[in-house]
Amino acid sequence: MFKFNTKVYYEDTDSGGVVYYANYLKFIERARTNLIQELGFSLKSLSEKYDCHFVVKNINCNYIQSAKLEDELIIQTKFIDIKKASFELEQNIYKRDRVIFKSKVLMVNINLSGKPIKIPDSLSSVINV
């Protein structure tokens, strides 16, 4: 389980001070980037060394409760499944120990031509399902 902390800034909210719905996807994207870094990689190095580019193929999300300006949020990410060229994550956002957003995200590894390719062994070997 990987955790990423963030705060709701003015730029994340609508005119009512509530997080705009699409920004929850930004929050979980940032958490995924930090997850890769915590595993010892960077998106840039994966691209340069392996022609490896992770894209979202499918996302299923459930908005449970709104976050508001200056709320402290925790994004918890865990791997659910890994296959040859893809992996699935569960990413949930918490506010004060209460889940406010749930998602399952299917990521596919592609090359610059857009073709699915095998996840590098050096990365798949450190992914715990």
Segments the model singles out, each with a brief description of its role:
Residues 1-72, 80-129:
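Terminal targeting signals and extreme-terminal segments of soluble enzymes
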